[in-house]
C-alpha cells in the first residue's frame, strides 16, 4: 500500500513492469514534484530525457520483486543492546533488491564486511554499478523536494552521469 518516504507520499500500487514502475512512481513522480516546487530548466528537461532511456539500464536484467526497506541508510539501521541488528523508519515497497543496496552506498555508514557478506550471499548482476545511480537519484530528488539546497546540483550531476552512460 502507499506510504511516505520522509514527508513525501510514496505511491506503491502494484505494477507488472518494474521499469514502468520506476518511471511513473519513483523518478517521474519526484521530477513532477520538483517542477511544481519551482525547480525547472535543465534539471527537469534532462530528467525527462533520462526517463525515456530507462530500458537501456535493464538490458538482460529482470529483477524479481523483493520486499524492500525503501529508505535504508545508516541512520535507519542499528544494533539492539544485545547486538542483534535492527532496521527502522521504513518506506516499504516491492521492487529490485538493488534499490536498497544502492541507498546504503548513497550516504555511507555501512562496513565493508556488510557488502562482502551481502555479495557472497547475493552476487550482484552486471550493470549494478550504473543502476545504483539510477536508484539513488530517486532519493536525491526526494531530498531536493524536502530540503532544497545543493540537492538540485547533485541530482543534475547524477542525471548527466546516467545520460552519458547510455
Give the predicted meaning of each segment.
Residues 134-143:
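Short helix/strand-capping connector loops at secondary-structure junctions
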Residues 2-55:
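Active-site catalytic-loop/activation-segment of kinase and kinase-like phosphoryl-transfer enzymes
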Residues 43-65, 160-164:
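Short, intrinsically disordered, low-complexity segments enriched in Ser/Thr and Pro
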